[in-house]
């Protein structure tokens, strides 16, 4: 059984070592353990386009794997940024699907990181009217949404 209290304490220790004052809440998100950090320094923790947050999540998962036997992958969020971003990406995906179906033309989304592309692919996999494909190379990899033939 995963010790969420111990994991929370490890994250809090990391924040202290970073000189960040913050509170950590534990929950679930998309069937994963979810830690949301509330802090006045949220912009610093999120970074431009979520880059700092992705790095923070990576470091937290390394620390948990090192300190807690059989620690699962956990989601780390700051001020609900990821939840809001996921909802926004899902809306973009739905809008692109509607446009592809209505115009019968492919719709190319802006470049996204692999996590964001996965959200689009998973969301539109449920739509029987469209197909999706990733194209290009990082960091300019994008998704093309097409009406299903």
Cite the ranges covered by each PLM segment.
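RNA-contacting regions in translation and RNA-metabolism proteins
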Residues: 1-149
């Amino acid at each position: 059984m995963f010790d969420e209290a111990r994991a929370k304490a490890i994250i809090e220790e990391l924040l202290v070592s970073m000189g960040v004052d913050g509170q950590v809440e534990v929950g679930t998100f998309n069937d994963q353990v979810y830690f949301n950090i509330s802090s006045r320094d949220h912009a610093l923790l999120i970074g431009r386009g979520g880059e700092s947050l992705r790095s923070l999540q990576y470091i937290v998962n390394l620390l948990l794997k090192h300190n807690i036997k059989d620690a699962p992958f956990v989601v780390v969020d700051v001020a609900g940024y990821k939840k809001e971003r996921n909802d926004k990406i899902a809306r973009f995906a739905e809008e692109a699907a509607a446009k592809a179906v209505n115009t019968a033309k492919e719709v190319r989304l802006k470049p996204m990181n692999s996590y964001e592309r996965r959200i689009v692919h998973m969301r539109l996999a449920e739509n029987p009217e469209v197909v999706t494909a990733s194209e290009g190379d990082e960091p300019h990899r994008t998704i093309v949404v097409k009406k299903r033939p």
